[in-house]
């Protein structure tokens, strides 16, 4: 039995599936993976800032022009479309087996594919709020704000994306709900993540179910604990499963 058949068998016998995903889920939608060799972290920025520094709270407050220049160029992809991974997970949710998607990504491709139960650990690029009057801007309205720094049309204060920056804490309500669904799962599929970003990666420790599956292009710290490890692109793997 090959690994795809094994995965199909595990899915068939599971009733409470949770998918935990990272940047690798969206790379097949042409959104770069932060930590792959050709990802954002390896870009030559031509200045003395790392990518982590550029998307930190400190950079947002002290150098907002640099922050927003980097953010809009490398973290926001308004034309991206769901890929095979997003489509498969949406179809699996419709069967009633998939109870939740826990994602580290800030795009909304899971929702665009039709998924309803999505827990976004690092926030959403589709939500943007004025720091003064709290006016809401969706992604389109946010990108239409003129100038190197987006200022609110009502009060003139800075509009901040509702995403978790480096040096900021995660939304503990979302984190707690993610921990709960992972704890209740009988199958946890980890896909497209190197499991090195904390505290998000620590959520895996809440899993106590029957089967742990890892699907990733490179090895992860959880491989030795997994019941099944498949090396490859997640969309390609899911495309071989029964829809």
What kind of region is each of these model predictions?
Residues 1-243:
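Conserved catalytic core of sirtuin-type NAD+-dependent deacylases
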């Amino acid at each position: 039995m090959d690994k795809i058949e094994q995965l199909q068998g595990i899915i068939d016998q599971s009733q409470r599936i949770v998918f935990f995903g990272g940047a690798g889920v969206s790379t097949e939608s042409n959104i770069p993976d932060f930590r792959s060799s050709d990802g954002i972290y390896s870009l030559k920025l031509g200045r003395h800032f790392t990518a982590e520094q550029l998307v930190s709270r400190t950079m947002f407050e002290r150098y907002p022009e640099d922050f927003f220049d980097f953010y809009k160029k490398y973290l926001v992809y308004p034309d991206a479309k769901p890929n095979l991974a997003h489509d498969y997970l949406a179809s699996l949710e419709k069967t009633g087996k998939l109870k939740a998607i826990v994602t580290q990504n800030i795009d909304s491709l899971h929702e665009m594919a039709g998924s309803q139960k999505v827990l976004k650990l690092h926030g959403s690029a589709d939500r943007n709020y004025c720091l003064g009057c709290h006016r809401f801007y969706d992604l389109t309205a946010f990108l239409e704000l003129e100038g190197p720094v987006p200022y609110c049309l009502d009060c003139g204060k800075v509009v901040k994306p509702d995403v978790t920056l480096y040096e900021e804490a995660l939304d503990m309500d979302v984190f707690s709900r993610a921990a709960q669904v992972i704890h209740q799962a009988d199958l946890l599929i980890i896909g497209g993540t190197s499991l090195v970003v904390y505290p998000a990666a620590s959520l895996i420790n809440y899993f106590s179910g029957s089967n742990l599956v890892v699907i990733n292009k490179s090895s992860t710290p959880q491989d030795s604990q997994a019941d099944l490890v498949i090396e490859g692109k997640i969309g390609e793997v899911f495309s071989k499963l029964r829809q």
